[in-house]
């Protein structure tokens, strides 16, 4: 996802889940899977923002086969800079579970 209006549509119409490091905005859509990753300037300079987005992309790739179709937007919070990858991973899985985005409810 790259268009501002796509992001705004999901922000307004989708449901959201918060954790200490990540915010998920999710809009279920059949047959369509779009993903966006954002990090505000509150996080820090471009290096820190890009690192946060790379971490979120890596986590999404791990779970992408087990998720239902829809539009996902992951917003990195300021605390992601100091957090370990393991802690971010736990937060990531927790918000995906709370948002009921897994195909299999056993995960």
PLM region descriptions:
Residues 1-107:
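Positively charged, solvent-exposed patches that mediate nucleic-acid binding
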């Amino acid at each position: 996802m790259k268009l501002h209006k796509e992001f705004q549509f999901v922000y307004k119409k989708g449901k959201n889940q918060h954790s200490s490091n990540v915010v998920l905005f999710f809009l279920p859509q059949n047959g369509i899977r779009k993903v966006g990753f954002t990090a505000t300037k509150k996080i820090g300079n471009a290096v820190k923002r890009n690192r946060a987005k790379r971490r979120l992309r890596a986590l999404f790739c791990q779970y992408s086969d087990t998720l239902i179709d829809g539009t996902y937007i992951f917003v990195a919070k300021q605390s992601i800079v100091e957090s370990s990858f393991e802690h971010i991973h736990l937060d990531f899985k927790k918000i995906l579970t709370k948002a009921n985005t897994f195909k299999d409810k056993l995960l």
